[in-house]
Amino acid sequence: MSLGPGGFEATPNSVMPSDASLHNQSHHTDSLTNNDSIASTEQREKEVHQLARKYTQNSVYSTTSQNPFAAEPGSKLDPNGGNFSARAWAKAMLQTHTDDNQAHPLRTLGVSFSNLNVYGFGFDTDYQKSVGNIWLEAVGLVRKLMGQRERKIEILRDLEGLVEAGEMLVVLGPPGAGCSTFLKTLTGQTHGFYVDDKSNLNYQGVTPKQLIKNFRGEAIYTAEVDVHFPNITVGDTLFFAARARAPRHIPGGATIDQYAEHMRDVIMASFGISHTKNTIVGNDFIRGVSGGERKRVSISEACLSQAPLQCWDNSTRGLDSANAIEFCKTLRMQTEINGATACVAIYQAPQAAYDYFDKVLVLYKGRQIYFGPTAQAKQYFLNMGFVCPDRQTDADFLTSMTSHLERVVQPGYENQVPRTPDEFAARWKASRERAELLNQIEMYNSKYATGGEHLERFKESRRAQQAKAQRVSSPYTLSYTQQIKLCLWRSWVRLKGDPSITISSAMGNAIIALIISSMFFNLKDDTSSFFQRGSLLFFAIVINAFSSGLEMLTLYAQRPIVEKHSRFALYHPSAEAIASMLMDLPYKTLNAISSNLILYFMTNLRREPGNFFFFVFTSFVLTLTMSMFFRSIASLTRSLVEALPFAAILITGLTMYTGFTIPTSYMPGWSRWMAYIDPIAYGFESIMVNEFSGREFLCVNYVPAGPSYNVGGNNRVCSTVGSVPGQPFVLGDDYIRSTYGYEASRKWRNVGIIFAFMVILCAIYLVASDFITEKKSKGEILVFRRGHKNLDRSTGQDDVEGGSERTTTAANTKSDDIAIIEQQTAIFQWKDICYDIQIQKERRRILDHVDGWVKPGTLTALMGVSGAGKTTLLDVLASRTTMGVISGEMLVDGKERDDSFQRKTGYAQQQDLHLSTATVREALTFSALLRQPAHIPREEKIAYVTEVIKLLEMTEFADAVVGIPGEGLNVEQRKRLTIGVELAARPALLLFLDEPTSGLDSQTSWAILDLLDKLKKNGQAILCTIHQPSAMLFQRFDRLLFLKSGGQTVYYGDVGENSKILIDYFTRNGGPPCPPAANPAEWMLEVIGAAPGSHTDIDWHDTWRKSPEYAYVQAHLAELKEERSRMTDLSRTASRQAHDAASFREFAAPFWAQFYEVQLRVFQQLWRTPTYIYSKAFLCVSTSLYVGFSLYNTPNTLQGLQNQMFAIFTLFFLFGQFIQQIMPHFVAQRALYEARERPSKTYSWKAFIMSNIIVELPWNTLMSVLLFLCWYYPIGLSHNAEATDSTALRGAQMWLFVWVFLMFASTFAHFMIAALDTAENAGNMGNLLFTLCVIFCGILTTPEQMPRFWIFMYRVSPFTYLVGGMMAVGVADSSVTCAANEYLHFDPVNGTCGEYMAQYQAMAGGYVQNPSATSNCAFCPMGDTNVFLKTVHAEYSNVWRNFGLMWVFVVFNAFAACGLYYWARVPKRPTIEKEAAPIRAEGSLDSETVVGRTSAVEQQDAEKRAAF
């Protein structure tokens, strides 16, 4: 158990051993272990405990005198005090644990591996799927089913190594080397690849199978991706992790909750995030802690899992070098004090971080080229004949062995050194170091035989930690009940953190209930309310059933987090599932009572206590059952794209087979079974029986009736189905039996069946939650458009997780390639730049009088501590800010910047944002066509793109598809593309780059700097922020702008050869000397007191302002302004642009050129997204076929006409699913546009919004054809046109209405999402408006039956005209023939039935089936479909009017979408002041945090969206 998670803030005491001495003792112990065979686990743990006790006795705060859980406030053991020492705490905790006899024994877990081979199946490249070629995948599927497998890809080959308990292993290698796969293999996470059966892994006597099954949480893999619940605070997030792994017995007498809180506080203090305790974690869309802090939250959570074997995959990504060193220092302390084992893959490891590790593994394309002590690794390769350049770190030197572009060979060794991965591996296999390693592995395996004594002790320790109720073989610590309780607590915290969805859902349901109730207000207790009561109960049961539909989206959002916690063995996914169900119960209960209470009593449903409670109870049970239904769909599928189409068809089926839209007697025989598995059908029958059974309803309308029919008794009959001649009322039981086939005896039986459905679906949900995981990434393999690249099947290994190796093939670029970058002449300068933002009514200064310039042919680094405002300054200079107040002077050749400045500069953002479906060449071409000056011919722009591809060495993957992160281009290729997109625009002024090397390995970082160096040599002006680079990278910059906290300048000037000028400035002004081997970039942070643990008494900002260098900067700025202001030509080369007004426009391309290019790209995107198009097609075809064949050839009976009407009504349920498909797609498009393309002035917002609306129209046209054919003809609506010989015309008219319906749905989706941030909120808004449109369209209740207040809603509802048009086209001008149960029977007063009914028929219509009979007349009250149409206000004469009005709504949606987008999302310019007001810079804000703050303008936009 890792009792001491370690810390960033470890403050050693004067009598406490230093980290270095402790590390040396550890190495000494290792050497003894290697020389005297492998020490036993007990011996090693004994040594660790003895060392810890020795150090503890020397500590000022001895653990014998103080319990960490009862530490004195302000002491070194108090994590909430300012003097906290993580090392002192760890030793005190260990002593407390050792002194407690009831505490569980400590566990350690080393690992040996030999003959380790890992492989996968697939290709190094793949073809891009499109709407046209996806069918070719069927061929490959058939081959796979026939037993043919894809090509075997070797990922790791013949790996051997030994990492003992208490040791640290660093894994080095470029992307694609297999580092991620190796770490995953050690922890048993082998999804997507296979471990060879002959591979040997030994975890100190524990086998890999036992590790995965019984001890999963004892070996954890921490990926570089940060996934957390965004609306939970950091403190609660870490408390949960600590509580989930809390042992049964807590040493020191603390309770479990006290233990969890204490561990949380300790880990937060250790990693420097105590100040974020009450701040939500956030994510890319929800503002929370900064990116660096979120990374430390992820690290802290993993540490709290207390795993004895920890594998960290690039977990320092996003941290600067100082924090990366502290992270390694923390791991060092864990291993030495607690015996944990740490394996870390790290990029750009600083030398200080590398020195903390015991051993190093170097991988080269899956081959092991070295494994052994870190202190001997460098000499191993030097002995081969390689040279380590000055100031290159050991880690970078070892990694450079895997690149022929970077490794340097000693003179005379050119023909002796290895060159290929196989040659390096062969040299390793023949080495003395490998022979020693094999000997150590052999002794280790013999000492720790699998299934031996150590396994039993490991089990005993694990069992002592577990809850008593937990199974011995379970990997979890808490019992299942405890897991549920803990997850229930977190669910409550999540609900408190973000109650908006719950509140909005409850309010939405209450509003809908009020609206529906007002529509059916105070129904009469007579037969005139029969249809209305049925409609009301149908609507009520459907709303209750589908109120949980959005739970699918919630489950998919939390799925990655739950699966991560399951891998950490914190809890069963099913425990979280049960907790979420329990947490939803109060809301569902309250919602069921409030909504149904309003609906039940306002509408005058049966006002009896028993019936009311039965109605609420049935609705509540059905809500729970359908919640299980939606959760089951989400858990059984692996992605939302898979789930939505199936959910849509199932929702349609469940709705249709309730028994209301299609009565049981009208259900086709082949589909009647669907009603038996429809829980909604059972619920509807029960509440219909509950409402009608045992009641008598007075008759309102009799047949015959009128002035000539003053009759009674058996001579007239109530016109309602279920009536009896001569009876003045209709029994409710007769009505529901005749109309729906319902029986009162099935009322409670149906509730029991619904309960059974709930139990079955709940079981499916829980089992699937535990065993079905979400869809995994396929890996970063290149994807080409079919026909644009031949698959190369001869290449080497691929790292499933890490991607292909860097594709650079040439060390140098030809001078001809460099020459395509036109020489720049403009100089950009800035003076006294200040930037203020408003934070909680307080004006805060972020940048404080910053000066500088960037000249052509120079590479300037912008550096500073975290929170200094580096990215903020870059955004201000590049005119990317939309908030705050900017003051100062920013000039281009002595002149103010104009509207064209943004498009004339290139800005390569840190995030590599690109359209995933485009190829590299297309992305570059798009930028060139829209951002290069308009006067340049199109052919020249395209030719320029080809030259940029050559310059950036992207020829090999120029036609590859970008893909999404994790699939497609790897990190280096994406970074090259990001820079290429800016270069393709031919920036006339300069190039901004924000952290171009962040998260990259040293080789890739060097390659990026190579590229920047090429651009600089050809006259490109470059300003680049960079996170504390290595010494070799830092030397490549010409100038440095160095900021301290508060955005204040510390230094601006030349760097000098070997940083001599920079070093001289700081030493001359009181800084300590820079050691020869030190990294100047890290040294200068220590000098100004910005590095962890460093301090200075010198005010370096004040020193700069008083220095001669500052005076020179001011003088030179004035000189530049005076000289350059004489120049009037802002162009780089072409004099023809001197007086071209177009060169000063905001956008380079005219609007219609923008619109054409954007429209073309969006069309290509949809064509290359077959999942989107085919899911849309599947949704339309499946739903229409389902409806069509469920109502196959519906006859023109009274109920048949109702069925035909509901066939149209049911089709409208496509609406919600249709817009839910469009909205997420639009959100992804908008994110790219607003993050990269809008700030760079690539094209206007009008082109963006219009293109996204129009691109849906042709696909909707195709979908309308499919939907029409699969729906119109099966139902038999075409037969109604045969009487008037207008089959073709009526068919065409129906297709037009189907077409305009889909057009309306598409534009409505854009109308909803245009101003809102998330598809979920827009979906809620859309569903509410859709519900209102359906309620007021005239189907469920006619205009005559509506309260007069709602008549305006009937007239403004688009569906009113859609229903009127479709009903008239589908049903008009046809005869009606009643079914046997629909005829009304009565006796005539005298004469025949025909004579008796003649006057009534002339007045009301209908026909007599037996006109010549003199008794028992059979009368059908309707003989013409036009009579039915009049009841719903649908007339064929208004067909074209209704069609035209629908297009009015479509056009309105489109214009409303544009207007709302402009109103709520188009940014307004920040305030710019010539002179800055004197504001004290209080504290510092992380640049990430600053960018994430809400400005006054953004706040207004957010308020507009919220108000909307």
UniProtKB/Swiss-Prot annotation:
<keyword id="KW-0325">Glycoprotein</keyword>
<feature type="transmembrane region" description="Helical">
    <location>
        <begin position="1172"/>
        <end position="1192"/>
    </location>
</feature>
<feature type="transmembrane region" description="Helical">
    <location>
        <begin position="1296"/>
        <end position="1316"/>
    </location>
</feature>
<feature type="transmembrane region" description="Helical">
    <location>
        <begin position="643"/>
        <end position="663"/>
    </location>
</feature>
<feature type="compositionally biased region" description="Polar residues">
    <location>
        <begin position="11"/>
        <end position="24"/>
    </location>
</feature>
<dbReference type="InterPro" id="IPR010929">
    <property type="entry name" value="PDR_CDR_ABC"/>
</dbReference>
<dbReference type="GO" id="GO:0140359">
    <property type="term" value="F:ABC-type transporter activity"/>
</dbReference>
<dbReference type="InterPro" id="IPR013525">
    <property type="entry name" value="ABC2_TM"/>
</dbReference>
<feature type="glycosylation site" description="N-linked (GlcNAc...) asparagine">
    <location>
        <position position="83"/>
    </location>
</feature>
<feature type="glycosylation site" description="N-linked (GlcNAc...) asparagine">
    <location>
        <position position="314"/>
    </location>
</feature>
<feature type="transmembrane region" description="Helical">
    <location>
        <begin position="1443"/>
        <end position="1463"/>
    </location>
</feature>
<feature type="transmembrane region" description="Helical">
    <location>
        <begin position="752"/>
        <end position="772"/>
    </location>
</feature>
<dbReference type="InterPro" id="IPR034003">
    <property type="entry name" value="ABCG_PDR_2"/>
</dbReference>
<dbReference type="Pfam" id="PF14510">
    <property type="entry name" value="ABC_trans_N"/>
</dbReference>
<dbReference type="InterPro" id="IPR003593">
    <property type="entry name" value="AAA+_ATPase"/>
</dbReference>
<feature type="region of interest" description="Disordered">
    <location>
        <begin position="54"/>
        <end position="82"/>
    </location>
</feature>
<feature type="compositionally biased region" description="Polar residues">
    <location>
        <begin position="55"/>
        <end position="68"/>
    </location>
</feature>
<dbReference type="GO" id="GO:0016887">
    <property type="term" value="F:ATP hydrolysis activity"/>
</dbReference>
<keyword id="KW-0813">Transport</keyword>
<feature type="transmembrane region" description="Helical">
    <location>
        <begin position="501"/>
        <end position="521"/>
    </location>
</feature>
<feature type="transmembrane region" description="Helical">
    <location>
        <begin position="1322"/>
        <end position="1342"/>
    </location>
</feature>
<keyword id="KW-0812">Transmembrane</keyword>
<feature type="domain" description="ABC transporter 2">
    <location>
        <begin position="828"/>
        <end position="1070"/>
    </location>
</feature>
<dbReference type="Pfam" id="PF00005">
    <property type="entry name" value="ABC_tran"/>
</dbReference>
<keyword id="KW-0547">Nucleotide-binding</keyword>
<keyword id="KW-0472">Membrane</keyword>
<feature type="transmembrane region" description="Helical">
    <location>
        <begin position="1206"/>
        <end position="1226"/>
    </location>
</feature>
<feature type="glycosylation site" description="N-linked (GlcNAc...) asparagine">
    <location>
        <position position="35"/>
    </location>
</feature>
<dbReference type="Pfam" id="PF01061">
    <property type="entry name" value="ABC2_membrane"/>
</dbReference>
<keyword id="KW-0067">ATP-binding</keyword>
<feature type="glycosylation site" description="N-linked (GlcNAc...) asparagine">
    <location>
        <position position="231"/>
    </location>
</feature>
<feature type="transmembrane region" description="Helical">
    <location>
        <begin position="610"/>
        <end position="630"/>
    </location>
</feature>
<feature type="region of interest" description="Disordered">
    <location>
        <begin position="1"/>
        <end position="35"/>
    </location>
</feature>
<dbReference type="InterPro" id="IPR029481">
    <property type="entry name" value="ABC_trans_N"/>
</dbReference>
<feature type="domain" description="ABC transporter 1">
    <location>
        <begin position="136"/>
        <end position="390"/>
    </location>
</feature>
<keyword id="KW-1003">Cell membrane</keyword>
<dbReference type="InterPro" id="IPR043926">
    <property type="entry name" value="ABCG_dom"/>
</dbReference>
<dbReference type="Pfam" id="PF06422">
    <property type="entry name" value="PDR_CDR"/>
</dbReference>
<feature type="binding site">
    <location>
        <begin position="864"/>
        <end position="871"/>
    </location>
    <ligand>
        <name>ATP</name>
    </ligand>
</feature>
<comment type="function">
    <text>ABC-type transporter; part of the gene cluster that mediates the biosynthesis of the sesterterpenes ophiobolins, fungal phytotoxins with potential anti-cancer activities. Acts as a specific transporter involved in ophiobolins secretion.</text>
</comment>
<dbReference type="InterPro" id="IPR003439">
    <property type="entry name" value="ABC_transporter-like_ATP-bd"/>
</dbReference>
<protein>
    <recommendedName>
        <fullName>ABC-type transporter oblD</fullName>
    </recommendedName>
</protein>
